[in-house]
């Protein structure tokens, strides 16, 4: 017997989330400008931690903007937070924990909260193959006039990487300079071309070294942030090609989409998740465009750290591979899925598959690995 995880999760209020986070170690919370609560990063800290763990109530998802760089639901958060304190719990135990803290019983004797294991497993398996409905979530938009504040000229850093003036102008890339703030500006638009956020590629060395290379831009008193897990960068420009070819290539960063715009022009069928994670919202957006093939092209894994043994590094590398398989599993019930993996040393550590040029990208495409349903389900 086990809890109905979806019913428990959907029933949670903001107050319930407060209770759960307080119990996990975040004694209070802050708020962002959109009214989303921000907690301490209990996901990867046993105590303390910065206020970089955001909760998006509509999506029922957390996002850690520091070490995790990842999206996850409340059950996964519980598993991670408990693990930081040396307590390993199962997924079902995490559901029970959440239900207990939130006081979810759904009736006398928990009759509605518990359901038969065999039945839920069968129905969940069958449910994977149902056609995904088109999504209708619309993110808040910002006034377009903010774009007039930016210097409308490309920065030499990106020009030096081979991105053309034409593409940088087409994607509205600019530059913002004020005391204590400097960086390349990257407007983000949704499928309907609405301005929903602006990210900044910092040019301040101290910020880059501290891990804040890409962050939401603040102009005056307005922070131009958005839920990146609910939008894919570049789709306002590439959706027609994606629909025409019925395929999509998913990168981590905006810059890779820009490079492919120069490589392929109107045949560019790429987008970017702006992290190393693919959310269910990303999947549903792409399925709504009718894709039949998905290519996952995340950055090459990091180099070994100082004093890290080869054995430990290989363990971490395998964990990264398993993570990619789990991301692929979001798509395998619906479409053909491929992963671009550099076995031949064509890329440097942390390179995007697009960073070494069109020929290298196409060589990686030729060597792509197809992921089956069983492989994606590890």
UniProtKB/Swiss-Prot annotation:
<protein>
    <recommendedName>
        <fullName>SPbeta prophage-derived uncharacterized protein YorJ</fullName>
    </recommendedName>
</protein>
<dbReference type="GO" id="GO:0006260">
    <property type="term" value="P:DNA replication"/>
</dbReference>
<dbReference type="GO" id="GO:0008270">
    <property type="term" value="F:zinc ion binding"/>
</dbReference>
<dbReference type="InterPro" id="IPR016622">
    <property type="entry name" value="Phage_SP-beta_YorJ"/>
</dbReference>
<dbReference type="InterPro" id="IPR036977">
    <property type="entry name" value="DNA_primase_Znf_CHC2"/>
</dbReference>
<dbReference type="GO" id="GO:0003677">
    <property type="term" value="F:DNA binding"/>
</dbReference>
């Amino acid at each position: 017997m086990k809890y109905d995880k979806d019913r428990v999760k959907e029933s949670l209020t903001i107050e319930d989330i407060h209770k759960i986070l307080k119990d996990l170690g975040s004694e209070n919370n802050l708020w962002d400008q959109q009214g989303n609560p921000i907690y301490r990063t209990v996901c990867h800290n046993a105590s303390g931690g910065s206020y970089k763990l955001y909760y998006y109530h509509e999506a029922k998802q957390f996002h850690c903007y520091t070490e995790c760089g990842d999206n996850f639901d409340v059950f996964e958060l519980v598993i991670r937070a408990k693990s930081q304190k040396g307590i390993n719990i199962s997924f079902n135990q995490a559901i029970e924990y959440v239900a207990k803290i939130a006081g979810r019983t759904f009736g006398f004797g928990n009759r509605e909260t518990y359901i038969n294991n065999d039945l839920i497993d069968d129905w969940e398996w069958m449910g994977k193959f149902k056609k995904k409905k088109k999504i209708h979530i619309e993110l808040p938009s910002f006034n377009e006039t903010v774009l007039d504040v930016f210097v409308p000229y490309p920065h030499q850093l990106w020009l030096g990487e081979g991105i053309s003036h034409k593409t940088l102008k087409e994607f509205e890339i600019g530059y913002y300079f004020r005391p204590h703030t400097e960086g390349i500006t990257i407007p983000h638009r949704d499928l309907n071309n609405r301005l929903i956020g602006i990210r900044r590629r910092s040019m301040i060395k101290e910020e880059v070294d501290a891990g804040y290379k890409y962050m939401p831009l603040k102009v005056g008193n307005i922070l131009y942030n958005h839920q990146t897990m609910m939008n894919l960068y570049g789709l306002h420009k590439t959706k027609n090609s994606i629909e025409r070819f019925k395929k999509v290539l998913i990168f981590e960063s905006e810059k890779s989409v820009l490079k492919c715009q120069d490589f392929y022009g109107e045949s560019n069928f790429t987008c970017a998740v702006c992290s190393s994670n693919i959310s269910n919202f990303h999947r549903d957006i792409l399925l709504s465009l009718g894709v039949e093939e998905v290519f996952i092209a995340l950055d090459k894994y990091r180099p070994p750290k100082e004093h890290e043994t080869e054995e430990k590094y290989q363990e971490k590398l395998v964990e990264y591979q398993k993570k990619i398989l789990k991301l692929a599993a979001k798509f395998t019930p619906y479409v053909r899925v491929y992963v671009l993996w550099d076995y031949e040393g064509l890329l440097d550590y942390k390179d995007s598959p697009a960073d070494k040029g069109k020929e290298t990208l196409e060589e990686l495409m030729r060597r792509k690995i197809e992921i089956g349903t069983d492989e994606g389900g590890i």
